[in-house]
Amino acid sequence: MSDDTSASGGTSAPFPSPVTADPEPGATASKLPGPIRSNIPTPATSGTGIPQPSKMKAPSSFGSTGSVSKIGRPCCNHTTPKSGPPPREATSMSRESDDNLSSINSAYTDNSSAVLTANTEQFIIGQRVWLGGTRPGQIAFIGDTHFAAGEWAGVVLDEPNGKNDGCVSGKRYFQCEPKRGIFSRLTRLTTYPLAGAQTPTSPLAKSSPDRSRTVSPTASIRSSMLRSPGIGGKNGMAVGDRVIVSSGFGSRPGILRYLGETQFAPGNWCGVELDEPSGKNDGTVDDIRYFECKPKYGVFVPIAKVSLSPSSKKTRLSRTGSRESLTSIGTMNSIATTATSRMRMNAQQRKSSTPVKPILATPKSQFSMQDLLREKQQHVEKLMVERDLDREDAQNQALQLQKNINELKARIVELESALDNERKKTEELQCSIDEAQFCGDELNAQSQVYKEKIHDLESKITKLVSATPSLQSILPPDLPSDDGALQEEIAKLQEKMTIQQKEVESRIAEQLEEEQRLRENVKYLNEQIATLQSELVSKDEALEKFSLSECGIENLRRELELLKEENEKQAQEAQAEFTRKLAEKSVEVLRLSSELQNLKATSDSLESERVNKTDECEILQTEVRMRDEQIRELNQQLDEVTTQLNVQKADSSALDDMLRLQKEGTEEKSTLLEKTEKELVQSKEQAAKTLNDKEQLEKQISDLKQLAEQEKLVREMTENAINQIQLEKESIEQQLALKQNELEDFQKKQSESEVHLQEIKAQNTQKDFELVESGESLKKLQQQLEQKTLGHEKLQAALEELKKEKETIIKEKEQELQQLQSKSAESESALKVVQVQLEQLQQQAAASGEEGSKTVAKLHDEISQLKSQAEETQSELKSTQSNLEAKSKQLEAANGSLEEEAKKSGHLLEQITKLKSEVGETQAALSSCHTDVESKTKQLEAANAALEKVNKEYAESRAEASDLQDKVKEITDTLHAELQAERSSSSALHTKLSKFSDEIATGHKELTSKADAWSQEMLQKEKELQELRQQLQDSQDSQTKLKAEGERKEKSFEESIKNLQEEVTKAKTENLELSTGTQTTIKDLQERLEITNAELQHKEKMASEDAQKIADLKTLVEAIQVANANISATNAELSTVLEVLQAEKSETNHIFELFEMEADMNSERLIEKVTGIKEELKETHLQLDERQKKFEELEEKLKQAQQSEQKLQQESQTSKEKLTEIQQSLQELQDSVKQKEELVQNLEEKVRESSSIIEAQNTKLNESNVQLENKTSCLKETQDQLLESQKKEKQLQEEAAKLSGELQQVQEANGDIKDSLVKVEELVKVLEEKLQAATSQLDAQQATNKELQELLVKSQENEGNLQGESLAVTEKLQQLEQANGELKEALCQKENGLKELQGKLDESNTVLESQKKSHNEIQDKLEQAQQKERTLQEETSKLAEQLSQLKQANEELQKSLQQKQLLLEKGNEFDTQLAEYQKVIDEMDDAASVKSALLEQLQNRVAELETALRQANDAQKTAYLETKELRRQLESLELEKSREVLSLKAQMNGASSRSGKGDEVESLDIETSLAKINFLNSIIADMQQKNDALKAKVQTLETLPMDFTKPHAFDALTKRKPAPRLFCDICDEFDQHDTEDCPIQGSEDQDYSTPSSESNNNEKERKLPAPRKYCDSCEVFGHDTSECADDETY
């Protein structure tokens, strides 16, 4: 193929027209070898003189890109054209390109396409190579080209035997001299010359099967096989769909413009606008317009002959471009083109062949669906063979046409060279004409000059002539000589004039003749110029059109390149995702295809096995019947055995009853075990269901376990503390018991002392002298009693103080209880918040899926647990309150008893002092316990901190539920703070953890039911919120009260400070005398006062801050509620906005995906298919090799089938052996019966063993019962311990009742303390004021001290003066020291008073510290709330950012949509521009479908061979079975025959002994017996004939042709059906013309009339055309072997 052919676009006309005018006489169009008319209709010429394509469709391989790899290897040698042929009109432009020849010849150039070098990466530009191993040159270009796909090498040859100068189709790839450039594949280049390499003389030479050269005319065939599967009438097609019209001229594509009834013929018709002007009308028939189109583009066809084009069908993305889609298209095209081959092959047999009898339909019972499928497959195989022949004929015709095209191109080149010569001649003629014209002008100018001279001379002559007579008259005598001279001169002049005139006339005549000749020449040249100009104009127009088309093509290419670049830019962005999707889909497609292939293979194998098994079943049924009888016998035996077993079962049932009696004791335990087992089974089922959930939950459970372990540690610590407290309580109780015992002993002693007193009284009466002593002793006793009463009063005061302390403790506990209640309320509020958030989470969980539901379920479970824990804490608090009340009551009762006993005796005072010390110890122990509790609370807080860390880490992993988990953490913190007094064991936690996994499954179900309950609970929670607000107000009121109490305390402090200040003023007067010692004490007091003032100020600040924080908390709670409402609203709005945006995004993504899919499809079709089909060709070659291998394997299988016949015979022997084996099996069955009897015995033994095992199990159960009893005993012990603990609890409750009494007293004392606190607060305020005054006084004192220091200096100066006065001073100093000692004693007393004040201050400090703790907790809560606010603000900021991002994304999406719309518009323009290219791509698809069809043919042939093998095997089996049956029948008949012969002989022998009367009867018996014998002989003869026929069938099957690939391979099996006849659907006539050739359709040719039936009857015979030329070397029709060129072209 020449490189001037443009293969890229496929726009160059493959059928150029010859030039109409030929100036050379020899170069006429008649000499051009045209195609011999066989079945090709005459093409209709267009306006430009270009022949239109024939109605017969070119083979689908013309436009294929599959042959691109063999581009440039045609079979013919044609001259290289310098310029391309003129293009066709846009309306009639064909889609075939100039690479058709290479695509057709690719099937015949296997020698030229041999791979010489596999490593193509070694070649470099400038490297010296040998083309084909023979022609040397240098590489000048390596890369992709526009004329063909793939990588090509441009080589500059050493010799001018190339094809071009580096330019192909107007595109320059490199530059070299003409005829030295050539393009070749890299695989055809070598780096060294090949020794035996020669150019093949006939590159297309290859072996091909012989076939007939007679060709029959084509015709339209009306057959059901032409109907494609896609046709469904109006349901399958719609107006505007792209369709294919199948007819005798091939399949023609077009667009469906009309579908419905017409007036020119009944029925539904399809009006199609064809792509090429090969139709009949312009949409109008009989002056009725059905649709509009160009003339010769419209045609009306029945619906049966129209099928949807594959391009119009909406195929799935995963199937487009796949092999299945290509094969389906190929089968559609192949079915559409089978009718012509059948007509062509069977037209010659129409006369000679007798009509085949129609095949009678057999019943459905005789033939299965497999037989029908086999018949259909055979029919399809015939159609495929005919199609192959038709395709080969079409390819040969195309080769001939291509050869004609090449010759026309050579003719065009010659005509172009002639044009150049003519142009040169015209230029020379124009030069000569210009010269002639110039010479003529000069001659005309000279002739005019001469004429003027002649005219002047004539005028002079006339003047002379007129003057001569006067001269003669005047001077005749004087001038005779002059006259003669003048006359001579005149004569001479006249002669000269005549000569000149003659010369001028001759010249004028010559000039006139020359002018006429030149005019004639000019006319002739003008005519030639006009003709040449017309020719040049036509050629220039054609060249302009061609150049414009080339320019347009180049522009289109440029635009294509630009669009490709844009598409590549867009595609590269989407290609990654698309390739990924394609990869996934391709994997799925491959998987599905593999599954389909496996299913097909399995179905085929199952069908073959089913056929074999049906045959085997027929054989085995007889054996089964025999075995059924044996089984019946065995069943009878088994029945007997079963009866025996039933007897044994009765025995075993008796044993079972015994076992049941034994098991009744264990049934309850077994029921419990069964319940537990059922629960375990259910849990296992739930675990099986939640395995996937557990994988995720295991991590969470592990975290929870860690938390649980930490909680265990904390709880163990708390339990240890509680145990210690309990131990301390028990020790206290023991001490109280001891004290009670001591009191009882004391009472006993009192009673004894009273007895002694009575005795003493008796003695006093006897002894009067002892009265005085007794009076004195009584006085002493009275004094002691007074002292004891004083001590008793002191004790009562101490008791009151203790009561006050108890009241303070009770108040503290009440405060703690209130705090716990507030915390519980807060926890409930937090629970409400969590529930609200849970509802939000549920809404989110509907979107988030299982994880959200799991988290919600977890949180719900945790909340339920926390609720239960909170309820437990409340119950425990209530129990503690009741215990405290009971203990207070007990204390009150004890106090009453103590008071009564204190009145009776004074000895109790000492014990009371001891009790005071013990109470102090208990208080110390309690304080230590409080310290321990505080340390443990700190440990709990540390554990909570660790829990917070863990929860934070968990929150990082769970970003979606971070807020909830933080809140849950807060709740857990508060609840862990509340759980300081709880009693919880590790077993409960483990049970909770075990329940947790169960509740996770049930939580999902409960969520739906609880969602309704939550809505009701929300209303309750709102009420509870109102109650909480009231509680907050109450707490505020309590805070105001506390403030008032603080003020009172301050006042009391101020009063005490006033007193102190007064004392200080007194001390100052005394301290003026003292210099140094008093100042230190004052400084200490001042520092203490400053510390107390600072602490008071700090406490006031804390109180104010607490108030502010409470107010801020209120505002924060309200703000958080509002923010939560706003956030929920914004979340709802955002969710709706997000849903809308997601919907829009999904729509835009869908649009983008569609656009990207279209762009990808276009780009991939333009880019990938060109390369992909090349690879497919390689794969086809590989597959062909594989198929050849398979054919060889199938031949071997056929040989194996022949061997299988021998194996069948051997199997017959083996079947006999099987019979013996069956007999042996019968014996084995009998043996097995014996074995079963033995088994029955073994079963009996096993039953016995099982009974022993059951007994062993019973023993085990007894042991387990013992263990259970031990456990029950342990449980009883635990119950006893619990009872004891309950008793202890009761005791504690009683003590609590006593304590409650004490609490009441303490509460009363607490009221007094509150009053005192109010007073103290007032004192504190007064003290603050006094402190300010004291500070001013201290400043003054400091000033006085300075003055005193100055005085001391002065006194030191005056020491020398005062030495004399030192003695007096020493005396004064001694006096002062005495006074100082007194002052020290007073100071000690004051210090004691100060210590008491410090104790009170310490108590107030403890109260303040508790308040500080509560304030700290409030601060922590505030900080947490602030953190929540921050998180909410961050979330709101994040949401705002997300909104802004979404807005930006929306704007970007809108911009991208606008860009995409612009791109879509450009794409539409691009689609309009690519319409013709898509046609070429469609032809490429058709070619690929052809290749796939070839593969299908090979697969079908393989399947045919396999079916043939199966048929042969089936036939062999059936023949073998029939022979078996026949042999059996023959044996039975022979037995009957022998029996009848014996009976006849016996009758003959008996006839001889009978009398003559019975001769007639005997003759009748003989006749009947002879008739029977004849009948039996006839039956035997029929059976033998059938046997012979079956043997003949077997022999024919054995002698089948081994090569089923030949076209006549199946002629031995079935006869060819007669070819279908021509039929016109409009005229409703046979054998006249096709529907598409009906003259009624033609809108222009209305002169046609419907042919009559007589003409049909008379003109049934059709003449055959003359045989076509055929090339043996090329194996192609269209040229003879002698005309074939031998050189190889590229």
UniProtKB/Swiss-Prot annotation:
It holds the Pfam family CLIP1_ZNF. Disruption phenotype: RNAi-mediated knockdown has no effect on nuclear positioning in fat body cells. Its main location: cytoplasm. GO terms for biological process: cellularization. Residues 1040-1052, 1410-1419 have a biased composition (Basic and acidic residues). Keywords: Actin-binding, Coiled coil, Cytoplasm, Cytoskeleton, Golgi apparatus, Microtubule, Phosphoprotein, Repeat. Residues 1-11, 39-51, 214-226, 865-885 have a biased composition (Polar residues). GO terms for cellular component: axon; axonal growth cone; fusome; Golgi apparatus; kinetochore; microtubule associated complex; microtubule organizing center; microtubule plus-end. The modification Phosphoserine is found at S64, S67, S216, S309, S322, S325, S328, S1682. The keyword Phosphoprotein applies. The modification Phosphothreonine is found at T327, T362, T1681. InterPro entries: CAP-Gly_dom_sf, CAP-Gly_domain, CLIP1_ZNF. It is found in: Cytoplasm; Cytoplasm, Cytoskeleton; Golgi apparatus; Cytoplasm, Cytoskeleton, Microtubule organizing center. Residues 1-105, 195-227, 843-905, 1031-1052, 1400-1419, 1635-1665 are annotated as: Disordered. Specifically expressed at the tip of the furrow in cellularizing blastoderms. CLIP-190 and jar are coexpressed at several times in development and in a number of tissues, including embryonic axonal neuron processes and posterior pole. Residues 378-468, 484-660, 667-916, 926-981, 1001-1121, 1158-1549, 1565-1600 form a coiled coil. GO terms for molecular function: actin binding; microtubule binding; microtubule plus-end binding; myosin VI heavy chain binding. Residues 143-185, 260-302 form the CAP-Gly domain. Together CLIP-190 and jar may coordinate the interaction between the actin and microtubule cytoskeleton. May link endocytic vesicles to microtubules. May play a role in formation of furrows during cellularization. Interacts with Lva. This is Restin homolog. It comes from Drosophila melanogaster. The lineage of its organism: Eukaryota, Metazoa, Ecdysozoa, Arthropoda, Hexapoda. The gene is CLIP-190.
